Amino acid sequence: MLNTLLVVGFGGFIGAILRMLSINLVNKFFPYSISLGTLFVNILGSFIIGLLFSYAQNKGLSPLLKSFIGTGFLGSFTTFSTFSYQNLLLLQSGNYLHFALNIILNVFLCLFAAWLGFLIFK
C-alpha cells in the first residue's frame, strides 16, 4: 500500500508541474476568453488515459504503473476543477456563448480523444 501511495504521489507531482507549464505556454500563445491551455491538457490527458487502459486491457500493465500514470500523473495533469471555475467565471461575466462553447469543446473533444487513444491498442 505504501508503494502505491508513493507512486501515485510522484505521478501527481510530475503531472501537476507539467499541467502548470502546459497551460501557461498554450495560454501565452493563444490568449482567448476560453482557456485553450486547460482544453489542451484535458484533451491530451483523455487521449493518454484511452491509450493506458486500452494497453492495460490488451497487453497487461502492472498495477503500480497504472496507478502512477492513471491516478497520479493524469489525475493532476488534467483538471476538472479549473474547467469548472473557468466556466463559472464565463457565466458570471455574461459570456454565455463562450461558456457553452467551452463546455461543448471540453466534453466532446475529450471523449473523442479518449476513444482515439483506446482504439490504438484495440
Model-derived features: where do they sit?
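Membrane-interface helix-loop junctions in multi-pass transporters/channels
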Residues: M1-K122
